[in-house]
């Protein structure tokens, strides 16, 4: 057996393993790996090209250069295998051992390992309790360190300079104390550390310490020491006595032509180390002066540093061409490093690439493959068939036949290709639909033919795109390609569950033309329409031109009733629609009414969706193919095209522009008169112009979409309306007006471009528009890179999220309701619960009976019923509340969107979620505007209009009537709710503080009626009582200045930022109201009528003026919103996923209570929220410049903002909990995608959020070994607590923490996955000191070690392996996994 093993060249160790451990190597281990010491820096002899003995390429140490041949040539051939040549000392064996065997260098003086020294926090520094600066001084021979103070006044580990040392030695004598320098000194300190004793001591210190900084330091040190104790490593191993040398084949030396050599940088670095080491040895032997030896030691330390991580300390060592040398760390790092270049991204053979062209006569599951390519790709299969059929006797003969392209080769190629799918891929592969399998059809020419319907999935077009072809070789691969990746199996998009195989462009136009509704059609009464009995008659009439495609006819339609038996019905329709009906599958749930209308792109998509849901996949594919044929055919026949005259400029354009210009003049005048500020004027101008642009666009659309008898329908409108090409925004610029432009900085130029492209732009207009356009191009380039990086981070954080079981049995879930925005339903309840599992029974509100029990998977019909029943809130299961230990369970995930069925075990939902969110990333803008640079920004909302008829209720109503008897809203969180007759909520609107309320409780309103209005550009401060104004702390020149506007010459009183001024530090500018008797007026909430003024407030009343209730005392301008400086688009999504704190964020109340203002600090204001019931107070410090949105005495609720601004996700989690956080993140991210019209299912975002919530922070350790403030994995924490409870001890208490995706990826359980993501050296250093074990649970780790991934079909293999090993243990067999018998495999 042993001999056999030797022949097969099997290594001693078994290749099957379940986990990988990383640890520091001890010097003994390094020596045991080594096959010999390297003593000389030489590489190879430049005359003979043979490696030098004992050099870096030595054959004696590393093995022979040629297979089974020693260096001197005494022993050749297999028969001498295993013999060591006595002349040259080389073992006769395979040359590939030069890839495996290592050597070592014995160092004359120990050196510190740079990873453990410089990687922050410095591990060596933590162990010996010195700072990195101090350590470097010792290691690089600048200072001595006291090792044993003896009876002197020195402290242990005190640093001494050379002079101080000599002085102390003179003072106390040479032997009174011991001091050392260099790595030896550090090593002796490390050797003196007793780990177990330290552990106990530090824990005791932790219990006693009170200072926070000290605690943090102790915790860090304790963690490190515990890691060492657990992994069994010794601290002194961080100092190296031996340096390992990697195998020579991994740092090759390649002869180039012309007698020169190309060598790996590592050889240079090793040579440096060896040279310096040898020199040091010699100097020590010669008893050279201390200073020389010390310098040499320092140089040795530097050369070893450069070998491990060049450039980490000091200047990088450079080669001959001034380029820094690539060290061992650089080999692992970055995109070109070992992890990402070779382990995660390998190149494959049996592949080719070519340009794609359209192949409309293909079936959906086919692609056209050029014969030339197929011949090359399927070579091995062809060779085997040629031999099998006896056309060729040997492989060589077969090869020759193929090269000559003999006729029989083509026949065999046809046979080989039949039923053998190939995979097509288009870069960039942004989601899994970027690789799909097709059956090849051989074609002439050199371009690959692609079916038009799959272009959406590949995001391909035919303007020169290229695609790659890959051949699945093994039977299993072919099986997976056919069953899982075939284009016919990928009809629905995994991102939103809608069909992705939808017709676009020409096909849509053709179908739209077929199903047009012309004015003639509308004007013909039904009974006057011609009647036809069969389709044949209709076709004959069309041929004879007695009817057109769009004439109204009555026809007999063959269809099925609800039971599915064939019936005939009469329908009123057009011949064109009958042609579509002919290809529609017959099914009771796919009625003719579905296509008996004008088919736009969206309608066609709905038809395909319905066919897929009710008739199944096969029918759907056939239908889609026929639809495509019909659409293309009709588009060609229709001959729709347009000329310049089809773009009609509305006649009213001129007067609209004149009207707006008049308004702008008026604003200018108001500004001159000092009624408004410059910022307000700018805002109003911009608003007026954007309204004008919209009106012109509206007029143009109205003009173009006019349909009259006898006049052909406008082609441009048909293209836009059908969804084939062009959007109203583009048409606006062609025939309306171009509108406002933005400067690159994001500000809007207030002079709009009045012309459109048809009229042509003036020079100035053209120049203004190039601004935005050029910026758009620059942005696109940035966007692609940013979007790719976001996707990469998402994949990395979610890659180990896999469906592991069917049901975790949790009772928890999330509450979902429809998403409203400004009274419009943006995402209905049925949309949000579709494909999810109920976590509670749903009750019918009228009868109170159970409609659907918990754990029902909501299908389309369920969702419709729930919405019809008027249910507004449903509780569903979610991955966020799933209790599976590794991965998530099927019930909590719900429906697999790409298949429309419950999700399978083993589905890699994490990666799917990451791709679904990342793939549309390139469509998101980098900023909030762009349509060829044209600024888009809605006129600021300044009123609320009813979106439905209904009855008004006002939530949190708190109003005062002003002198004109108008109700002014005084509440900070007032909402108007519209309900229908049954009392169901139809819409809900936020009404800001200071708005004029135009309706009231219980009023009946009609659609589009104004409910409230306000000034969008200022925040008012309003009084709720009448009285006399008194200024407090408003000192001229300190807190108050009179600003005079240069243009208008008018003055206004403005509160200035007073904290810069020494006199103003303690002042708190405010207004107060007094009544006739001179007392301060009391407000309704029983506080004094005092109003605090924040900087930039403009006073509207004079000191001593009389005011009425509802009057404005002061106003704070909202500054000229630059194209709304909210981070939009991609950066916003990244900001949310990275859980960054936005700048100028909101401060939210952590308890319910009343607001009080405490004593101010120098630069901060103190707000206290006092809970009336419990009496507890929470304090918030707010920088003085910020505008506080509450007044003294206001009542705030948990989670209400005290300072306006974007909310911080961490605060939401802390105050309101996980459900509120998920709600916030899901809605915020969806808002960004919705703006671009991208649909993504909520569950994908939830999967990512789940991964961001993996860690908890310990608040109270109980009887566990955790430390306060430590971050622990949630699962680990829960397991530990269960253990403690079983043993009757106190469990730990913790709170969830939200981590950004980058941080979460770097802190996964698997160090392999983290190291291959980012910051490789840091991750590996951490893992090595802790002696981490990677259990290979995620996808990435398994790809890196070259296994099948534990998802999809790989998860089945995994299960079988587990069953098998379980059986083995039961039988007591060894670890070799037996081949499963058919019976076991079936289990």
From Swiss-Prot:
Q: Which residues bind Zn(2+) 1?
A: 70, 72, 85, 88
Q: Which amino acids does the record list as binding Mg(2+)?
A: 461, 463, 465
Cofactor info, note text: Binds 1 Mg(2+) ion per subunit.
Q: Cross-referenced InterPro entries, in alphabetical order?
A: DNA-dir_RpoC_beta_prime, DNA-dir_RpoC_beta_prime_bact, RNA_pol_asu, RNA_pol_N, RNA_pol_Rpb1_1, RNA_pol_Rpb1_3, RNA_pol_Rpb1_3_sf, RNA_pol_Rpb1_4
Q: Which cofactor does it need?
A: Mg(2+); Zn(2+)
Q: What class of enzyme is it?
A: transferase
* EC code(s) of this entry: 2.7.7.6
Q: What is this protein called?
A: DNA-directed RNA polymerase subunit beta'
């Amino acid at each position: 057996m042993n001999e056999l093993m030797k022949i097969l060249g099997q290594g001693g160790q078994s290749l099957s393993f379940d986990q990988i451990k990383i640890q520091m190597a001890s010097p003994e281990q390094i020596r045991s790996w080594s096959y010999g010491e390297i003593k000389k820096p030489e590489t190879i002899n430049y005359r003979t090209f043979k490696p030098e003995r004992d050099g870096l390429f030595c054959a004696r140490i590393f093995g022979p250069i040629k297979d089974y041949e020693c260096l001197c040539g005494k022993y050749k051939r297999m028969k001498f295998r295993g013999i060591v040549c006595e002349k040259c000392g080389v073992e006769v064996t395979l040359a590939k051992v030069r890839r495996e065997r290592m050597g070592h260098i014995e160092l004359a003086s120990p050196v510190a390992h740079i990873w453990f020294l410089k990687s922050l926090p410095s591990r060596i520094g933590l162990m010996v309790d010195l700072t990195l600066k101090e350590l470097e001084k010792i290691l690089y021979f600048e200072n001595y360190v006291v090792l044993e103070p003896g009876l002197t006044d020195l402290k242990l580990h005190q640093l001494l300079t050379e002079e101080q040392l000599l002085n102390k030695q003179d003072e106390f004598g040479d032997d009174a104390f011991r001091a050392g320098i260099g790595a030896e000194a550090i090593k002796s300190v490390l050797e003196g550390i007793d780990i177990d004793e330290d552990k106990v001591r530090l824990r005791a210190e932790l219990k006693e310490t009170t200072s926070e900084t000290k605690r943090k330091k102790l915790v860090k040190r304790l963690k490190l020491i515990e890691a060492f104790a657990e992994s069994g490593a010794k601290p002194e191993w961080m100092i190296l006595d031996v340096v390992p040398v990697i195998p020579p084949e991994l740092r090759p030396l390649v002869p180039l032509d012309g007698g020169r050599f190309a060598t790996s940088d590592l050889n240079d670095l090793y040579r440096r180390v060896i040279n310096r080491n040898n020199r040091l040895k010699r100097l020590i032997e010669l008893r050279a002066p201390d200073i020389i030896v010390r310098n040499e030691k320092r140089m040795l330390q530097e050369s070893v540093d450069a070998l491990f991580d060049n450039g980490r300390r000091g200047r990088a060592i450079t080669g001959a061409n001034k380029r820094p040398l690539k060290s061992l760390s650089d080999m692992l790092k970055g995109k070109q490093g070992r992890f990402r270049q070779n382990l995660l991204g390998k190149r494959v053979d049996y592949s080719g690439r070519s340009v794609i062209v359209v192949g409309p006569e293909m079936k959906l599951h086919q692609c056209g493959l050029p014969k030339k390519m197929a011949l090359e790709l399927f070579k091995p299969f062809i060779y085997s068939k040629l031999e099998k059929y006896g056309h060729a006797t040997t492989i060589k003969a077969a090869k020759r036949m193929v090269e000559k392209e003999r006729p029989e080769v083509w026949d065999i190629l046809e046979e080989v290709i039949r039923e053998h799918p190939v995979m097509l891929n288009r870069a960039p592969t942004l989601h899994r639909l970027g690789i799909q399998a097709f059956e090849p059809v051989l074609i002439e020419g050199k371009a690959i033919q692609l079916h038009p319907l799959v272009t959406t999935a590949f995001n391909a077009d035919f303007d020169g795109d290229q695609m790659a072809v890959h051949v699945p070789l093994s039977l299993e691969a072919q099986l997976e390609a056919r069953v899982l990746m075939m284009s016919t199996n990928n009809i629905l998009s995994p991102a939103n569950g809608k069909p992705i195989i939808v017709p676009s462009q020409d096909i849509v136009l053709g179908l739209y033309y077929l199903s047009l509704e012309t004015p003639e059609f509308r004007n013909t009464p039904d009974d006057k329409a011609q009647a036809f009995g069969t389709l044949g008659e209709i076709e004959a009439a069309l041929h004879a031109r007695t009817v057109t495609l769009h004439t109204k006819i009555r026809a007999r339609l063959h269809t099925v009733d609800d039971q599915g038996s064939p019936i005939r019905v009469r329908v009123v329709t057009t011949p064109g629609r009958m042609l579509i009906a002919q290809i529609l599958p017959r099914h009771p749930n796919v009625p003719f009414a579905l296509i008996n209308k004008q088919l736009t792109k969206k309608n066609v998509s709905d038809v395909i969706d319905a066919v897929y849901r009710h008739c199944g996949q096969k029918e759907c594919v056939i239908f889609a193919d026929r639809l495509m044929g019909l659409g293309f055919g009709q588009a060609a026949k229709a001959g729709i095209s347009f000329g310049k005259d089809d773009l009609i400029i509305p006649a009213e354009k001129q007067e609209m522009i004149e009207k707006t210009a008049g308004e702008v003049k008026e604003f200018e005048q108001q500004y001159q008169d000092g009624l408004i500020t410059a910022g307000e004027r700018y805002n109003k101008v911009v608003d007026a112009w954007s309204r004008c642009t919209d009106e012109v666009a509206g007029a143009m659309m109205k003009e173009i979409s006019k349909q009259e008898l006898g006049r052909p329908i406008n082609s441009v409108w048909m293209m836009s309306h059908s969804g084939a090409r062009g959007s109203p925004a583009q048409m606006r610029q062609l025939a309306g007006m171009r509108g406002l432009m933005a400067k690159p900085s994001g500000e809007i130029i207030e002079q709009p471009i009045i012309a459109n492209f048809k009229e042509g732009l003036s020079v100035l207009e053209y120049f203004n528009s190039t601004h935005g356009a050029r910026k758009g191009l620059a942005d696109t380039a940035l966007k692609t890179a940013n979007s790719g990086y976001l996707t990469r981070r998402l994949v990395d954080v979610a890659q180990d999220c896999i469906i592991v079981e069917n049901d975790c049995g949790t009772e928890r879930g999330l509450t979902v309701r429809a998403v409203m925005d400004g009274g419009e339903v943006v995402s209905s309840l049925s949309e949000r619960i579709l494909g999810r599992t109920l976590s509670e029974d749903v009750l019918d509100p009228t009868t109170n009976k159970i409609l659907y029990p918990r754990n029902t998977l909501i299908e389309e019909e369920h969702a419709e019923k729930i919405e019809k029943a008027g249910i507004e809130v449903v509780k569903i299961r979610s991955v966020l509340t799933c209790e599976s230990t590794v991965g998530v369970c099927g019930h909590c995930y719900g429906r697999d969107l790409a298949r429309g069925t419950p999700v399978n075990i083993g589905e890699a939902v994490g990666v799917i979620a990451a791709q679904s969110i990342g793939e549309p990333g390139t469509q998101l803008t980098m900023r909030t505007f762009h349509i060829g640079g044209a600024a888009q920004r809605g006129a600021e909302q300044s009123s609320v209009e009813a979106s439905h008829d209904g009855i008004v209720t006002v939530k949190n109503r708190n109003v005062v009537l002003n002198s004109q008897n108008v109700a002014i809203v005084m509440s900070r969180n007032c909402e108007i709710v519209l309900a229908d007759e049954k009392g169901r909520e139809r819409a809900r609107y936020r009404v800001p503080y200071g708005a004029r309320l135009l309706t009231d409780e219980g009023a009946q309103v009609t659609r589009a009626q104004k409910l409230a209005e306000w000034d969008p550009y200022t925040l008012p401060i309003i009084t709720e009582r009448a009285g006399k104004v008194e200024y407090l702390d408003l000192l001229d020149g300190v807190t108050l200045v009179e600003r005079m506007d240069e243009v208008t010459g008018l003055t206004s009183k403005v509160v200035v930022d007073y904290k810069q001024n020494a006199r103003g530090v303690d002042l708190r500018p405010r207004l107060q109201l007094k009544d006739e008797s001179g007392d301060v007026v009391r407000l309704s909430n029983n506080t004094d009528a005092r109003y605090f003024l924040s900087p930039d407030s403009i006073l509207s009343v004079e000191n001593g003026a009389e005011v009425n209730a509802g009057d404005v005392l002061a106003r704070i301008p909202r500054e000229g919103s630059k194209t709304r400086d909210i981070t939009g688009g991609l950066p916003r999504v990244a900001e949310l996923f990275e859980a960054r704190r936005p700048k100028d964020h909101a401060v939210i109340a952590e308890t319910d209570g009343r607001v009080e203002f405490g004593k101010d600090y120098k630069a901060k204001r103190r707000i206290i929220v006092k809970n009336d019931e419990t009496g507890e107070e929470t304090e918030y410090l707010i920088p003085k410049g910020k505008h506080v949105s509450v007044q003294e005495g206001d009542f705030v609720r948990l989670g209400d903002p005290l300072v306006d601004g974007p909310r911080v996700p961490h605060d939401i989690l802390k105050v309101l909990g996980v459900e509120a956080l998920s709600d916030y993140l899901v809605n915020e991210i969806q808002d960004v995608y919705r703006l671009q019209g991208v649909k993504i299912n909520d569950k994908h975002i939830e999967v990512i959020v789940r991964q961001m919530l993996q860690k908890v922070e310990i608040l109270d350790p109980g009887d566990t070994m955790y430390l306060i403030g430590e971050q622990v994995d949630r699962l680990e924490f829960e397991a530990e607590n269960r253990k403690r409870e079983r043993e009757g001890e106190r469990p730990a208490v913790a709170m969830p923490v939200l981590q950004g995706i980058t941080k979460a990826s770097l802190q996964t359980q698997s160090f392999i996955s983290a190291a291959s993501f980012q910051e490789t050296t840091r991750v590996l250093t951490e893992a090595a000191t802790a002696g981490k074990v990677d259990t290979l649970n995620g996808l990435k780790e398994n790809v890196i070690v070259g296994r099948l991934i534990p998802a999809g079909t790989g998860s089945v293999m995994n299960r079988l392996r587990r069953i098998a090993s379980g059986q083995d243990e039961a039988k007591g067999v060894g670890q070799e996994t037996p081949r499963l018998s058919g019976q076991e495999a079936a289990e």
